């Protein structure tokens, strides 16, 4: 069921392979471009709402879990290609990745850069070691049990794990994907200095296209900006 926050827009929900997919249609004439919200479609949606008002499609497909397993990233790529063909839109989408959706967005862009024009990352999970509570994040035992079960981690194996997004910044930088990032400087769930700040520093050191908006005193929630215009203006430079 499509979230009530999108009630002002036409939308469809349907089956895509073994997952549930959603497409939201823009106000007025579509501009042939897609925003791909990778996770939590109905949460803090003001960026997507504004993009719908500006003529963009918004799409989403569910996942069995949050942790961006590679088989699911490949499924996301098949979904984007199918939706672009169905809608007559460009395959190069705007990624919108919030929290764990940032992990999905990063891996998607790394594997399928031909399907990405620009990425908006909001308090993104870019470091699984941090997410699991082996840093400054508050340890969530239920999350750790779930992560360790799905990804076959032990407390020893995750300490030597080197397949988080922050371990692939050199490869990612070479793809020349513009990034706009939003974060709270008091995030206790996905601490910025262990996640997004690593990407920010790397982009700045290597001349990447980047805009960053920090929110003083903000924890992991709420996501986004009260006025999404700065995010929208950044992404529209690259579509």
Question: Can you describe what each PLM-predicted range is?
Answer:
Residues 1-30:
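N-terminal cap/lid segment of alpha/beta-hydrolase-fold proteins
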Residues 97-107:
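Glycine-rich nucleophile elbow surrounding the catalytic serine of serine-hydrolase chemistry
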Residues 31-40:
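Short beta-strand element of the alpha/beta-hydrolase
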Residues 87-99:
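Alpha/beta-hydrolase fold nucleophile elbow
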Residues 140-195, 201-204:
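The feature captures the conserved acid-bearing segment of alpha/beta-hydrolase catalytic domains
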Residues 107-156:
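Hydrolase active-site cap/lid region
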Residues 189, 193-239:
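C-terminal catalytic histidine-bearing segment of alpha/beta-hydrolase fold enzymes
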Residues 67-88:
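Alpha/beta-hydrolase active-site loop
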């Amino acid at each position: 069921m499509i979230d009530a926050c999108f009630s002002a827009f036409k939308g469809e929900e349907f089956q895509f392979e073994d997952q549930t997919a959603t497409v939201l249609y823009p106000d007025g004439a579509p501009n042939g471009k897609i925003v791909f919200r990778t996770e939590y479609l109905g949460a803090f949606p003001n960026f997507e709402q504004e993009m719908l008002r500006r003529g963009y499609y918004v799409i989403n497909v569910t996942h069995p879990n949050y942790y961006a397993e590679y088989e699911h990233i490949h499924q996301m790529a098949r979904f984007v290609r199918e939706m672009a063909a169905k809608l007559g839109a460009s395959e190069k989408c705007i990624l919108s990745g919030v929290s764990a959706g940032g992990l999905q967005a990063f891996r998607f862009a790394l594997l399928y850069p031909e399907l990405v024009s620009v990425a908006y990352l909001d308090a993104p999970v870019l470091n699984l070691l941090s997410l699991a509570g082996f840093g400054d994040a508050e340890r969530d035992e239920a999350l750790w049990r779930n992560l360790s079960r799905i990804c076959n981690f032990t407390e020893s194996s995750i300490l030597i794990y080197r397949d988080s997004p922050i371990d692939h910044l050199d490869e990612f930088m070479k793809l020349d994907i513009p990034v706009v990032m939003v974060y709270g400087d008091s995030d206790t769930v996905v601490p910025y200095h262990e996640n997004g700040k690593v990407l920010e520093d790397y982009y700045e050191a290597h001349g990447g296209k980047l805009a960053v908006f920090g929110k003083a005193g903000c924890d992991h929630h709420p996501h986004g900006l009260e006025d999404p215009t700065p995010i929208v203006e950044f992404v529209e430079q690259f579509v």
